[in-house]
Amino acid sequence: MIWHVQNENFILDSTRIFMKAFHLLLFDGSLIFPECILIFGLILLLMIDSTSDQKDIPWLYFISSTSLVMSITALLFRWREEPMISFSGNFQTNNFNEIFQFLILLCSTLCIPLSVEYIECTEMAITEFLLFILTATLGGMFLCGANDLITIFVAPECFSLCSYLLSGYTKKDVRSNEATTKYLLMGGASSSILVHGFSWLYGSSGGEIELQEIVNGLINTQMYNSPGISIALIFITVGIGFKLSPAPSHQWTPDVYEGSPTPVVAFLSVTSKVAASASATRIFDIPFYFSSNEWHLLLEILAILSMILGNLIAITQTSMKRMLAYSSIGQIGYVIIGIIVGDSNGGYASMITYMLFYISMNLGTFACIVSFGLRTGTDNIRDYAGLYTKDPFLALSLALCLLSLGGLPPLAGFFGKLHLFWCGWQAGLYFLVSIGLLTSVLSIYYYLKIIKLLMTGRNQEITPHVRNYRRSPLRSNNSIELSMIVCVIASTIPGISMNPIIAIAQDTLF
């Protein structure tokens, strides 16, 4: 009799949970339509892979790319709609979140054609690779729209787990295994630190998990200036710092960049920073509204360390991927300036604009590295000497992307940095902007050093890798060139395109 009653209660509880989930999906599902497209694409990939043979491989690329493009289209159609909170307060839809989701989708869309030839040459498992890319993209999109502490913790874990698997995708490579181990251990530690900070925030607010409700809870409990909030701020900053990889939370970055497959590095180098930046702006600006002076100071220290250490250590590197790893540490220091400035002086708009240009500059550079690596099998900067004599198109593309990363006019990187530094100067961050300007000049040195090698024509400096280089024709079926051309064009956009981009970015208030 007791078992019968317990069984009936279990069935009733299960039915209530199912009906509640169905109700949420029915009424709130339209607000996550772009994410649903990616989920449908994931299911379709699994179905095709389990029922087809090797001849259907092009369909896997087509489905992945189409899912991403359709998701971008759905986001664009939803632009300028009223902000909405759905799924019982777990998810928020507004222009600010959507523009970061657009950037993540753009990164993934460009990374897939960049990876095709690499996967074919290295004989990597295609379906799993595409599944991890789409799942990581999905996690990043949910992180951008996360509105409570649980979702903010679960969404990046979804992204991180896929990142660990992708970084160790070449299991026979010792460097890849080492990079994955370090990445996994440090990622697990940072997640523990982050959730510990969330627990302090949860307790101080009286048990609230939604971001805006946490602010109300802190006011009601009079805990907004308590030591507990300071402890929460420190732990959360350290946890988010792992995702952004500013100094001194950058130890995993060079090893992961060097040991992971190059298309994976290209994907992680931009998507992780975009998603973490979106999350950081909301966490610091909403729950820590009353501690703005404290988190401004913390981020200023991180920005200064990142800009100085990243650019100084990049000068000494001999590996192209390690050089870009330290360069990315310096670049995130510039992005942090926009986060500190905030919405009052156009900081978020300048950060979003620079992030858009950074995506094109960085992915364009990695597209060139993938192409060169497949034809020579080397990643050493010295082995790029004389590339212009063998493949002028590739050499010029790499040179333009590097010059744009350095911020030389009239390339896109110059105008992105100019607007970012100008907003910081207007906000009174004179010392921070001065450090940014000096380190930008410093970064030009090691970028120009590589460009000088590319353009050299002296036979004694050209290594056997370039002498035996198999040139890829300009008009070929090579999908890497598609991503490369798009990124190079976007990296060289003149300043005339800045105004409409900034106007769109300024329309992202939350």
From Swiss-Prot:
GO terms for molecular function: NADH dehydrogenase (ubiquinone) activity; quinone binding. It catalyses: a plastoquinone + NADH + (n+1) H(+)(in) = a plastoquinol + NAD(+) + n H(+)(out); a plastoquinone + NADPH + (n+1) H(+)(in) = a plastoquinol + NADP(+) + n H(+)(out). It is a multi-pass membrane protein. Its EC number is 7.1.1.-. NDH shuttles electrons from NAD(P)H:plastoquinone, via FMN and iron-sulfur (Fe-S) centers, to quinones in the photosynthetic chain and possibly in a chloroplast respiratory chain. The immediate electron acceptor for the enzyme in this species is believed to be plastoquinone. Couples the redox reaction to proton translocation, and thus conserves the redox energy in a proton gradient. Belongs to the complex I subunit 2 family. This is NAD(P)H-quinone oxidoreductase subunit 2 A, chloroplastic.
